[in-house]
Amino acid sequence: MARVEIRDYQGDFKDVAEFFHRVWIGEYGGKTWFPIPNPAFMRWRVGPESGGFNPVAYRSGELVGSVFSFPHSLRIGDTVFPVSISTGFTVDDAHRGVALQLVQRFREEIEERGIAFGIGLVFDDPTTPSYRFWTKYAQTFPKNFRIVFKSGFWAKFLEPHALARAGIKAWERIANRTLGPLLRFTPHKYDPHVRPYRAGDLDRCTQMLKTSTAGFDWAMAWQPEQLSAQLRNPAYETLVFERDGQVQGMVNYHSLPMQGRELVQAAMIDLWADEGLGFAERVRLLSHLCTHLAERGVHAVVAPRSAMMPAGAFVANLFMPAPQGFFIGVFSTSRSVALSPPKTWDLTII
């Protein structure tokens, strides 16, 4: 049998996207919602310019396993730690033995890079390979990896007809068929105070993010140049709420095709920050975003149910807790400290 080779990925991510699609459709298709990676987005998110570390496994020249990551800073309490956000852990069903090799290579690399924690998302569905692998790994190697907390997503249905076909659970399909006009409703349409982000907004957006997350137990720590790279990247879009010449709110998101029983076009809200906005203005900013996306053929909007996202504004715009949740798992290194589940948090997770 040919030997498995673990090496750093070098490529344009097109083969990786095809690999993900083949494996994930086979494992999860029609069973649970999952994102479909875009090669251009992956090149930006985990490519060499991001500082990403991407070990992949090959057997006889065939891609059979992968894990990708990108560096960031995470404030936990009063201390800022270097962390690695991991994503795309995928192993071909016929070569599951490479999973532990990939994990070990990832752990060795983050240790060598001086990373305090590796952080990743795990599906909460007990029937999925993701859940089974990571819960077993945590039980077997408790000093290496642990599940720290559970959360989920907000979801807004903009095109119920598409979601009635694509829904995983019968109740999802029935709800979209029978309650479609209600589910797509937003209390407002476009708001004159909302406009696209401009480069001159960077300092204000950086300050709003810092202020908005200052009281969180866990929060991503953004440097201006890092935030600028995301806000100006063509894979993302950002809207700001400006009043009396001052930016008082921002929402940043990216397109995220999601696979259920069928493929739907979704948008993931990554960042929300505001300073000086009341409940009504937050509702209007989110309504504006939903209107903007609906007119561009987006079927659904999702966002992590984190402290960053204003729950009241989401409820007012008829977002609902999505049926599928997730766990946040953490890899430990020699620089790690003891962690307690955060009551309030903000993480980039996809």
Can you annotate each of these PLM segments?
Residues L202-N252:
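Non-catalytic interaction/regulatory modules that flank or connect domains
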